UniProtKB/Swiss-Prot annotation:
The chain crosses the membrane at residues 12-30, 32-56, 71-90, 93-118. It is a multi-pass membrane protein. The lineage of its organism: Eukaryota, Amoebozoa, Evosea, Eumycetozoa, Dictyostelia. Its main location: membrane. GO terms for cellular component: Golgi membrane. It is found in: Membrane. It comes from Dictyostelium discoideum. The keyword RNA-binding does not apply. One of its GO terms (biological process) is vesicle-mediated transport. The keyword Lipid metabolism does not apply. This is Membrane protein P8A7. Induction: Developmentally regulated, is also induced by heat shock and cold shock. PANTHER family: GOLGI APPARATUS MEMBRANE PROTEIN TVP15. Keywords: Membrane, Transmembrane, Transmembrane helix. InterPro entries: Golgi_TVP15 (IPR013714).
């Protein structure tokens, strides 16, 4: 398998994980609206996180590279996805399955950090991480 094929497969896996996170967010948002404020807030959190993961996987604007530098590495991407997967884990079948799938995708990303270079978004594959200038502090 070539390196570009591995990038595309991992991008698709991360998009799948983002879709699971979004689905959990929609479910919790709708149910939490009437039952508990915690479910409502977690639903919004999962919804925003899932949509952002999917969008950043498709296109990663250059302006966001310095703000989300950890997301330009497979390990940072995998750690974020695994953390969200741990939060999703629940007693019901859907949340348990979604949490396990999301955690597995995160672990795969962290493993591939040591085997592949930096990830690229699906559409604008020319985005590269720019090093910060030395000697300038905000």
């Amino acid at each position: 398998m070539s390196q570009s094929t591995a990038y595309i497969i991992l991008n698709i896996l991360v998009i799948l994980a983002g879709c699971f996170i979004t689905a959990c967010g929609i479910y919790l948002f709708v149910n939490g609206l009437f039952h508990s404020i915690i479910g409502f807030v977690l639903g919004i959190y999962y919804l925003l996180a899932g949509v952002c993961i999917v969008l950043l996987e498709i296109v990663f604007p250059q302006k966001l590279v310095n703000l989300f530098g950890f997301y330009t590495y497979w390990f940072g991407k995998g750690a974020l996805i695994s953390l969200i997967g741990l939060l999703i884990l629940g007693n019901s079948g859907f949340f348990l399955a979604a949490g396990i799938i999301v955690i597995a995708v995160g672990i795969v990303c962290m493993i591939f950090h040591f085997l592949l270079g930096c990830p690229r978004p699906l559409i604008n594959r020319s985005v590269e991480r720019k090093p910060e200038p030395q000697g300038q502090h905000a």
